[in-house]
Amino acid sequence: MRSQLLRHGVRTAAVAALAFATTVGGASGATAQRHGTSPIDVTVNASGIKAPHHHEGGRVAFRVSTDAKDGRQLQVVRPHKGVPIRRVLRDLADAVSHTPSRAAAGMRAFEADAEAVGGAFVTRKVHEEFTTSIPDGTVYLIDFTAFLERPTKPVVKSLKLYGSHDGHHKELTRSPHSTVTFRDTDAGPRFRTEGLVTSHKPILIRNASSEVHEAQIQRVAAGTTDRDLRKYFDAMAQGKKAKSPFTGQPVGFGGISPGHKALLRIHGLKPGTYALTCYVPDEHSGLPHVFMGMYKIVHLR
């Protein structure tokens, strides 16, 4: 779900929200503790993904960090019952194609074969924790940054989730939180935010749309408006050069499938002006959703 390639001038689905892999293997825990779970500590960097091999299912909390200079993205996927991971990976390989029609077909195939259950964009200074409901079974942790850098040797690690005592249908939070909802509109996919005004408040991510979406949060120059973002992304979509409004590395939440939700806590995010964006390819056009208007300026104090 990384957008580095787009920002370097590559169009369409090369900046897809989901990575793929061909080889299986190799802060504060307050949010997880409030939900009665112990967090899964995940470190992702140039050496690979460090995480346990198994953990209790149900309400699962991932605590993600990196020491990589340019930051890292972790994406978690769960194949549907009976679907081999290699088939899912082939779907995702298509989803990150430079050809829009192939990218769209890849996203449709992925959504038929698996679920995106969340992810995290992290940097040296910003780590994250997200809690979501995942039933028993195997999920796969993917380093999407590694995929962009070396697509022939992507990195993925399996994680076996086993029976939970408290189930996986309980509410994620009873405490105050901000909300970011992904929704469909006549104009295309959009963000709806409620209470997203502080940099330290937990964020409830809800996918109420019909496709996979993400919520990147990236610092922009003070005074940047939604109109400025539209001009920038319109130029990029047309293959034109444009001055980037971004002044920092992306953080935020990775891809999540329709009907899913997660509670995200970002540690180390500074107050300021940020752009909320989604680069996941559309399942019909194959273009990143951000080219279709899925962006929004937010001011965090």
Question: What does each of the following model-derived ranges do?
Answer:
Residues 84-135, 225-267, 296, 300:
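Extracytoplasmic beta-sandwich strand-turn segments characteristic of Greek-key/jelly-roll folds
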Residues 204-205, 268:
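Non-catalytic alpha-helical scaffold/packing segments enriched in small hydrophobic residues
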Residues 1-32:
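Secretory targeting and sorting signals
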Residues 66-98, 200, 206-236:
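Contiguous segments within soluble domain cores/interaction surfaces
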Residues 38-57, 61-77, 112-188, 194-198, ...:
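Extracellular/periplasmic metallocenter environments
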Residues 34-36:
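N-terminal, intrinsically disordered, basic low-complexity segments enriched in Arg/Pro/Ser/Thr
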Residues 191-192, 203:
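Generic recognition of flexible, low-complexity loop/linker segments
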